[in-house]
Amino acid sequence: MRPIIFDYNGTLFFDADINEWAWRQTVNEISKGTIDFDEVYKEFKSTRNYIFIEHIFKMLGYPLEEDRINYWAKRKETEYYHRFCKEHNRKELAPGAEELFAYLRENKIPYNLCTASIKENVDLYFDFVGLNKWFDREKIAYDDGTFENKISMYRAAAERIGTKIECCTVFEDSLKSISEAVKAGCSHIIAIRNYDPDIKEIIQVINDFTELDYSIL
């Protein structure tokens, strides 16, 4: 059985509604309602926060000051995303996820987390949602400012559990990130709620982990 790399948002944690709400508040606050949010969100919803905010700044003609972009990238999470999760007590992982973790542990199959989230969100995932029960925080790969893109994140996530991404199964929901997993070298991908027939590396599509065929892992 191959080692496994999990994405988080949209894969282990179904938060599309939370992210859209948080981004809507953030973009409206920055632009004072002058930007067509739905149009820009369609194009940039799967990108890293910094890239999304940078694009908004460009649209508005604002100077691309790194500290200001970082401020808004973090504010989207700490002011809006975190608040929504806590006010609505959103902390349940995707159905079947914890059962899969238990199975992997019992069978001594290495696994790790690879997320484009920033540190502030990783803190929420571990301390509020409870990922600390299942993952080694020191080994996960996230947007700590050292990665150029998710391609390098995938490779690092695999290396930190003693393997290579070419040897792993990746669970991922975003078609953009699935393409990056392929570019990183992964040829064994299980897609969550998304499918592209042109990506031959996708071996199964599931709505959640209760539909997973363990025999293909």
Give a label for each model feature:
Residues M1-R2, K119, L124-L217:
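Asp-based, Mg2+/Mn2+-dependent phosphohydrolase catalytic module
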Residues A97-D127:
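Substrate-recognition element of Asp-dependent hydrolases with the DxDx(T/V) motif
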Residues R2-P95, R105-E106:
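N-terminal helical cap/lid subdomain that shapes the substrate entry/recognition surface
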Residues L12, Y111, V170-F171:
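Conserved SAM-binding loop
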Residues F14, L113-T115, A191:
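Hydrophobic residues in well-ordered beta-strands that form the structural core
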Residues N19-E20, S46, Y50, E98, ...:
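Alpha-helix N-cap/helix-start and coil->helix boundary motif
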Residues N28, E99-A102, E106, E159, ...:
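Surface-exposed alpha-helical segments enriched in charged/polar residues
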Residues G96-L100, M153-A156:
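Well-ordered alpha-helical segments embedded in enzymatic catalytic cores
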